[in-house]
């Protein structure tokens, strides 16, 4: 899980979602998981 100020899609499988007010990126590739912080 990467914590970044600006999250963005890395590949076409990445999906932007909101969980508990935080923007997150989930993907089939675990390296692409990101959270805005």
Swiss-Prot record:
The lineage of its organism: Eukaryota, Viridiplantae, Streptophyta, Zygnematophyceae, Zygnematophycidae. The gene is rpl36. The keyword Plastid applies. Belongs to the bacterial ribosomal protein bL36 family. The keyword Chloroplast applies. Keywords: Chloroplast, Plastid, Ribonucleoprotein, Ribosomal protein. Disulfide bonds: none annotated. GO terms for cellular component: chloroplast; ribonucleoprotein complex; ribosome. This is Large ribosomal subunit protein bL36c.
């Amino acid at each position: 899980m990467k914590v970044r100020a600006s999250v963005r899609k890395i590949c076409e499988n990445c999906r932007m979602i909101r969980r508990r007010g935080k923007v997150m990126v989930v993907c089939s590739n675990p390296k692409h998981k990101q959270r805005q912080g």
